[in-house]
């Protein structure tokens, strides 16, 4: 197993074999990092996990379902923080996202998935639904509250604002490279953004 990958969290529902299911998820994560989505097969996961064919197909009928569940385990849902200010909310949310990406192999997996998803509509749909949208939803709630508090002027395109807030971290991670634990100064980013967003 990759040294960066932690054991997955407990699976939802009532799995027939928790140990087998976690072994399958760990194997899927390792192979996604090592060979990518395109080369990953149910058989390779089964072999790596050391389980029988019936065990893996009893819960996952396809590679898409298995990878989707693996992404869900690795990238947890985020609740929108409510500290009373946009700066406080964004700092809390950004900290949670960075901490998540820095553990469990996420920082290694995300560039691999993003690169392959450009040419694979099915993978892109999984990536967007399970990784991108939950984070956008949390940030959207943060921005909506900021508008309600009068910190951001009304009438702005919130989807564009989400891109502006999230863009620097994505660019630093995938283009210029950097430590996920210390990507950039959130204070500096907030100062630059608020100069253009304040009423």
Protein language model features and the residues they cover:
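Amphipathic alpha-helical packing segments from all-alpha helical-bundle domains
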Residues: 108, 122-148, 158
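Amphipathic alpha-helical segments used for helix-helix packing
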Residues: 70-71, 101-128
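Hydrophobic alpha-helical connector segments
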Residues: 78-110, 161
């Amino acid at each position: 197993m990759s040294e960066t990958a932690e054991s997955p969290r407990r699976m939802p529902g009532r799995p027939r074999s928790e140990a087998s299911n976690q072994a399958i998820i760990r194997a899927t994560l390792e192979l996604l990092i090592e060979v990518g989505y395109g080369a990953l097969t149910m058989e390779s996961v089964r072999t790596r996990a050391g389980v029988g064919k019936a065990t893996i197909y009893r819960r996952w009928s396809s590679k898409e379902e298995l990878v989707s569940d693996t992404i869900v385990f690795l990238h947890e849902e985020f609740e929108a923080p409510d500290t009373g200010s946009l700066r406080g909310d964004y700092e809390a949310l950004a900290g949670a996202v960075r901490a998540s990406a820095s553990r469990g192999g996420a920082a290694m997996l995300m560039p691999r998935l993003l690169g392959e998803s450009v040419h694979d509509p099915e993978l892109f749909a999984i990536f967007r639904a399970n990784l991108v949208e939950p984070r956008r939803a949390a940030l959207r709630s943060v921005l909506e509250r900021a508008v309600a508090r009068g910190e951001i002027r009304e009438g702005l395109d919130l989807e564009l604002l989400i891109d502006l807030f999230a863009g620097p971290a994505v660019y630093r991670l995938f283009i210029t490279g950097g430590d996920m634990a210390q990507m950039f100064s959130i204070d500096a980013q907030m100062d630059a953004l608020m100069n253009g967003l304040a009423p």
